[in-house]
Amino acid sequence: MVLYTPGKTSGYPSEKIDSGIRFYFLGGAEEVGNVGCIIEDNTGTRLLIDYGMAPTRPPKYPSESPRVSDAIITHSHIDHIGMVPWLAGAYGTTLHGSSLTAKVSEIMWRDTYKVSSIENYPLSWDK
C-alpha cells in the first residue's frame, strides 16, 4: 500500500514551465485504470483530471498528486475517482463534475470502503 504524505512524496516535476502547458500523468497513461492527469500552464495553474486507483487486490494507487485547487471528475468509475477522497482531504481540492457523477461517486466510495474492510486491505484515504 502507498501512504501519501501531502507534498512530500510526489514525483511531480518541480521545474517551471517557460511557455505552453505541461501534461503529467500520475497513472493511466500506459495502463488501464489508475487514472490521473495534471495540466499545468506557465503561470503555475494546475488542473487535475480524474484521480483513481486500479481495482485490483490490493488496489494499485497512482503517483501522489501535487497540490491542486481544482479537479474535473469525468465519471464515477473507481479507476477515475478512487483517490478523490484523499485529494479532497489532503488539499481541500474543489471537485467539478455532473450532479449524477457526484451522487454515484459517493455510492462507489462507500462500496470501496466496505470491500476494503471485507478483504482486509487499507485505503490510502482511510482514517
Regions found by a protein language model. Give the residues of each.
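Short, hydrophobic/glycine-enriched beta-strand segments
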Residues: 23-27
